[in-house]
A protein has these predicted regions:
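C-terminal motif of bacterial Sec signal peptides marking the signal peptidase cleavage site
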Residues: 14-17
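Thiol-based oxidoreductase modules, predominantly thioredoxin-like and allied folds used
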Residues: 69-85
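Positively charged n-region of N-terminal signal peptides that target proteins for export
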Residues: 1-4
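Local sequence-structure signature of Cys/Sec-based thiol-disulfide redox active-site neighborhoods
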Residues: 33-70
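Structural micro-motif
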Residues: 89-103
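Bacterial Sec signal peptide processing site at the extreme N-terminus
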Residues: 19-32
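Non-catalytic, surface beta->alpha helical segment in thiol-disulfide oxidoreductase systems
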Residues: 101-135
Length: 135
C-alpha cells in the first residue's frame, strides 16, 4: 500500500513539475480576425520555429512576459497557407520576424510602437512599458 501511495505521489509531482505555463498563446487567423472584429486590445507576436532570430529572441521575450505577468498572442506565420498569409497582411504588414505588434481596440495605432527583430531585454521592457503593458 505504501508503494502505491509513493508511486501516485511521484506521478503527481512529475505531472505538476512538467506543466509549463506559457505567457504566449498561439492563435490562428480566424481567432486573430475575431479579436480585431471585437476591437480587443492585445499584443501579437509574429514568428515561427524555423526563424533563427525568433529562436534566439523567444527566451528573452518569455522571461520578460513571465517577470511582468503579461500574456500575449502569437501567429506562427509558417503555419499559414499562402492565401491566409496574404489575408493576414491586409491587417498587418510585416517585413520580417520576430515582430510584436500592439493592437489597441482592434487597430494598430502606429508601426513605430512595434518590436521588430531580435532586440534586447531592456528594449523589450521599454516597448511594453511605452504601450501600457508594464506600469
Amino acid at each position: 500500500m505504501i508503494k502505491v501511495v509513493i508511486f501516485i505521489t511521484m506521478i503527481i509531482i512529475l505531472v505538476c513539475g512538467c506543466t509549463k505555463e506559457s505567457h504566449i498563446k498561439e492563435i490562428n487567423l480566424d481567432e486573430f480576425k475575431e479579436k480585431i472584429a471585437n476591437k480587443d486590445t492585445f499584443a501579437l507576436y509574429i514568428g515561427n520555429d524555423s526563424c533563427t532570430h525568433c529562436i534566439s529572441y523567444r527566451p528573452i521575450l518569455e522571461k520578460v512576459l513571465k517577470d511582468y505577468d503579461i500574456t500575449i498572442y502569437q501567429i506562427d506565420n509558417s503555419k499559414l497557407t499562402d492565401e491566409e498569409y496574404n489575408e493576414f497582411r491586409t491587417y498587418i504588414n510585416i517585413s520580417g520576424t520576430p515582430t510584436i505588434v500592439f493592437i489597441t481596440e482592434g487597430e494598430e495605432e502606429t508601426t513605430l510602437n512595434r518590436i521588430n527583430g531580435e532586440v534586447s531585454r531592456d528594449t523589450t521592457i521599454e516597448r511594453f512599458k511605452s504601450n501600457g503593458y508594464i506600469k
